Amino acid sequence: MLRRTASLAFLSTVLLTAACAQPALNVAGKRQKLVLQVSDAEAAKWNLALNNAKNVQDELGASNVDIEIVAYGPGINMIKFDSVANSRVSEAIKAGISVVACENTMRNLKISRSDIITGAIYVPAGVVQIMRRQSEGYAYVRP
């Protein structure tokens, strides 16, 4: 009886461990997907988001991951031409990272497309874009 109980406990542990195991990244050529939220006015947060994007790209390889940074609210200032992060954001775009601007925020803050860094993508609502990406299997990070 004790032996049978011990065997069942061991089997349960093995099955539970297998069920809880995280899937490996980049399995069989599967492309990874990441969406980053930037909604703060702090340059430190912008730099953190850009660092996260670059680190993920470096770790997985640019051809193995789709990365999107969605800027809305006060975070929209990160992707303006006069931003302190301008050169880093431009580098990210050149490296294949999608940078997305929320048109709701732009309208509310009276920001035009001519104020935004070249190469940005525009969506009607930043939060809805993040929701869409999550439903498409993107991992979500808010630095």
Q: What do these predicted ranges mean?
A:
Residues 1-10, 15-16:
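N-terminal export leaders
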